[in-house]
Amino acid sequence: MVPREAPESAQCLCPSLTIPNAKDVLRKRHKRRSRQHQRFMARKALLQEQGLLSMPPEPGSSPLPTPFGAATATEAASSGKQCLRAGSGSAPCSRRPAPGKASGPLPSKCVAIDCEMVGTGPRGRVSELARCSIVSYHGNVLYDKYIRPEMPIADYRTRWSGITRQHMRKAVPFQVAQKEILKLLKGKVVVGHALHNDFQALKYVHPRSQTRDTTYVPNFLSEPGLHTRARVSLKDLALQLLHKKIQVGQHGHSSVEDATTAMELYRLVEVQWEQQEARSLWTCPEDREPDSSTDMEQYMEDQYWPDDLAHGSRGGAREAQDRRN
């Protein structure tokens, strides 16, 4: 009996059951890895371009020196162990960088901020955020928006803030602006003049070790006339150190101009400032309370408060004193 041939459909099933060629598998894996490597290299190049990743040394060149205040991984681990041991005792842990070294923030990790406020509440005495500007290390504007306060505006303080009713027509609600601004500030070194006022308006507390308040710029200089007052206004610092006039005219302050000026002042003393930070930082606990002693003083020096508010506050103080008597 002659055996019948298997149907073609059955014959076609055989090739599909064969094991794939090993070379094909390796080739596919190689292609997949090549794509991953290309994406990795593209990401690496982008980070290097943005300054978030240091460039590798060229072949044959000597390794780059360790930045001032920056410890190697071994040194960091060793100091961390010492800190943990010290934590079991009564004395607070203190780490000091090796002498002769310093570290400063990368330009991409440094921004300057300035806020303008309007008056809300009774007689417009409550300050609320109405405009916020953030500039980069090189002075490029990263954020500049008008912001609608949570309470009705009683006094626009246009002469000082530059804010008018028209600016509020397309203003961003405070809650929305706050999220946008904090996203830009977190993880950054923040520069500004009388920064506590800006953070208070934002209802935000930034780590003290990551703030650079330009009211302290005179401490790093020996310019005559800058130490006559406890705190010098941004306007005076700009004139004496940068030889530029700001906050002039009848249109009020410009938060972009003020933030840019603050960054210029910081860069003027950046080396000295970061050297001091490297010496005084690295204590446990790390952060100190923000200095709020300059709140009212700084606003008055920059002619922020309207005259009628100043008179009103004096009148209220007299009334309170009369009631006590």
Curated annotation (Swiss-Prot):
TM spans (from-to): none
Source organism superkingdom: Eukaryota
Motif (Nucleolar localization signal): 27-35
Keyword Zinc-finger belongs to the record: no
Pfam (any one): RNase_T
Keyword Nuclease: yes
Induction conditions: Up-regulated by p53/TP53 in response to ionizing radiation and DNA-damaging agents such as adriamycin. Phosphorylation of p53/TP53 at 'Ser-15' is required for effective induction.
A GO CC term attached to the entry: nucleoplasm
InterPro entries: Exonuclease_RNaseT/DNA_pol3, REXO1/3/4-like, RNaseH-like_sf, RNaseH_sf
Name this polypeptide is given: Apoptosis-enhancing nuclease
Stored Gene3D superfamilies: Ribonuclease H-like superfamily/Ribonuclease H
GO biological process: intrinsic apoptotic signaling pathway in response to DNA damage by p53 class mediator; response to ionizing radiation; RNA processing
Species lineage: Eukaryota, Metazoa, Chordata, Craniata, Vertebrata
Basic and acidic residues bias: start-end ranges: 308-325
Residue window of motif Nuclear localization signal: 165-188
Location in or out of the cell: Nucleus; Nucleus, Nucleolus
Keywords, ordered alphabetically: Apoptosis, DNA damage, Exonuclease, Hydrolase, Nuclease, Nucleus
Residues in Exonuclease domain copies: 110-266
EC number: 3.1.-.-
Enzyme class: hydrolase
Organism (species): Homo sapiens (Human)
Function: Exonuclease with activity against single- and double-stranded DNA and RNA. Mediates p53-induced apoptosis. When induced by p53 following DNA damage, digests double-stranded DNA to form single-stranded DNA and amplifies DNA damage signals, leading to enhancement of apoptosis.
Region feature (Disordered): 85-105, 281-325
Major localization listed first in the record, in broad terms: nucleus
